């Protein structure tokens, strides 16, 4: 039998051992701790969300190619790893330009999903100020194709540091 989520098995075993070894966990509060521990072990990890962001970006690229959009967007092409959160926030703002220019329902759904996934991932990163990073308006304007390529690169920076 193949275990699809091996990290669940080890967490469950740890919870069982804790219950067995500590008799005071046999109270109602102990049972609540056990249940919440099991639930939290089953929550998805953020790495999967970043992969979904990349998938959504590639889908947007295919949709835009069929529409022949020629907008230019502020693009961070060589972001320093210390500025990746600032760069990602700029990319998310520029996605709104694509949304406005395309007026396409499919792109609207994808951008809303992508924004939600990215915001959820950003909220899990500690809120710190990144000094020396360029503001969005200071970035060079590039084609949508270059914008999406750079966006994927920034997301991969988040995956590599997770």
UniProtKB/Swiss-Prot annotation:
The keyword Ligase is assigned to this record: no
Paired cysteines (S-S): 83-133, 90-136
Protein family: Belongs to the IL-15/IL-21 family.
Q: Which GO terms describe its cellular component?
A: extracellular space
SUPFAM superfamilies membership: 4-helical cytokines (SSF47266)
Looking at the record's lineage, which domain of life comes first?
Eukaryota
Write down the Pfam families for this protein, in alphabetical order: IL15
Provide the protein's localization: Secreted
Q: Name one GO biological process term.
A: positive regulation of T cell proliferation
Q: What does this protein do?
A: Cytokine that plays a major role in the development of inflammatory and protective immune responses to microbial invaders and parasites by modulating immune cells of both the innate and adaptive immune systems. Stimulates the proliferation of natural killer cells, T-cells and B-cells and promotes the secretion of several cytokines. In monocytes, induces the production of IL8 and monocyte chemotactic protein 1/CCL2, two chemokines that attract neutrophils and monocytes respectively to sites of infection.
Where does this chain mainly localize? Answer: secreted
UniProt name for this protein? Interleukin-15
A GO MF term:
cytokine receptor binding
PANTHER family attached to this UniProt entry: INTERLEUKIN-15, INTERLEUKIN-15-RELATED
**Which UniProt keywords are present, listed alphabetically?**
Cytokine, Disulfide bond, Glycoprotein, Secreted, Signal
Prosegment residue ranges: 30-48
Where are the glycosylation sites? Answer: 113, 121, 127
Residues annotated as signal peptide: 1-29
